[in-house]
A protein has these predicted regions:
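Structural preference for long, well-ordered alpha-helical segments in enzyme cores
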Residues: 1-4, 20, 27, 74, ...
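The catalytic Tyr-X3-Lys active-site helix of short-chain dehydrogenase/reductase
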Residues: 91, 232-240
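C-terminal beta-strand-loop-alpha-helix "lid" module of Rossmann-like NAD(P)-dependent dehydrogenases
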Residues: 271-283
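Phosphopantetheine-dependent thiolation modules in NRPS/PKS and related acyl-activating systems
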Residues: 1-56
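Conserved Rossmann-fold NAD(P)-dependent oxidoreductase catalytic core, especially the SDR/UDP-sugar
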Residues: 154, 158-162, 169-177, 181-233, ...
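Conserved structural-core and active-site-/substrate-pathway-adjacent residues in large, well-folded domains
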Residues: 4, 24, 72, 94, ...
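N-terminal Rossmann/SDR dinucleotide-binding element
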Residues: 34-158, 162
Length: 283
């Protein structure tokens, strides 16, 4: 797909809907200006950087008091960097819920990912502040026993969710399970035990949909997302997840949504994500 995109406009959903050479060839549109537009888009997005420092400081002051954080999706590219920053910039205990057959396997998995990005020995420096729980986010009560679930719900003060299927292609059932069902389970968890805010990582792609080439506008978590014009399975599932959070917010569950753009590599170290071949961000 990457090679084809250098010369042609590629409709990715159509590409995978009927992945035959005849169908792919019939749907390719050659465009001599495609690279020019890509460069124009890159420079346009580079200029869209505006931060409200006062609001940011107040936000950081509020959450500096949080002592127990549940971080989900910590083995992902974004998740591992969130873990790193939480360890560097807070004194909180970070609980990770990881799917594994044993505690040793779970520990080795998170250590492998952490040290891949931050160097040998970096994990051991902070391991005393990392609490690992074996579970499955797609299952009711995260696959925990009732007592384990209640205990977790009674001491976690904030939930950061970066767990997601980001392949942009695959079965609808997979996207629904990982990108929507997990968020429903997180909301159920937030309703149990002490009050806890949800911080959900979404994608900037849902803002544009079929209107991506139109003028940019301000779009926040207070605005209603829509499925109109979104044929991409990944984007549709992320819109549905945001709707779950919006409905929960109307019921008193506090949540914030952070819409990420393409995260490609660490600009300081040059490290790319481990599963670079599975992410369409590199197409």
């Amino acid at each position: 797909i990457s090679k084809l995109s250098e010369r042609f406009e590629v409709d990715i959903p159509q590409f995978f809907a009927n992945p035959t050479i005849r169908n792919i060839a019939a749907n390719l549109k050659e465009d001599a200006n495609i690279m020019l537009r890509k460069f124009e888009q890159t420079f346009a997005f580079k200029q869209l950087k505006e931060i409200n420092e006062t609001e940011k400081r107040e936000y950081q002051k509020k959450y500096a008091k949080v002592k127990d954080v549940l971080l989900l999706g910590a083995t992902g590219f974004l998740g591992i960097y969130l873990l790193h920053q939480l360890l560097l910039e807070s004194v909180a205990t970070i609980t990770l819920l990881i799917r594994a057959d044993s505690m040793r396997q779970a520990q080795n998995r998170i250590k492998k990912h952490y040290e891949y990005y931050f160097g040998n020995g970096s994990y051991d420096q902070y391991s005393h502040r990392i609490k690992i729980i074996i579970g499955d986010l797609t299952l009711d009560m995260f696959g925990l026993t009732e007592n384990e679930y209640k205990e977790l719900a009674n001491h976690i003060e904030a939930i950061i969710n970066s767990a997601a299927l980001v392949k942009h292609m695959g079965k609808n059932s997979e996207f629904e399970l990982i990108n929507v069902k997990i968020v429903e389970n997180i909301v159920d968890f937030a309703k149990n035990g002490i009050n806890k805010d949800i911080h959900h990582m979404s994608t900037i792609g849902i803002v544009y949909g079929a209107n991506m080439e139109k003028s940019k506008t301000i779009f926040t978590e207070y605005d209603e997302s829509t499925l109109d014009g979104l044929e991409n399975q990944y984007l549709r599932s992320k819109v549905k997840a945001e709707k779950v959070l919006k409905n929960a917010k109307n019921q008193g569950v506090q949540s914030s949504i952070y819409r990420m753009s393409g995260i490609l590599f660490d600009s300081k170290t040059g490290k790319y994500q481990i599963n670079v071949n599975e992410s369409s961000a590199y197409i």
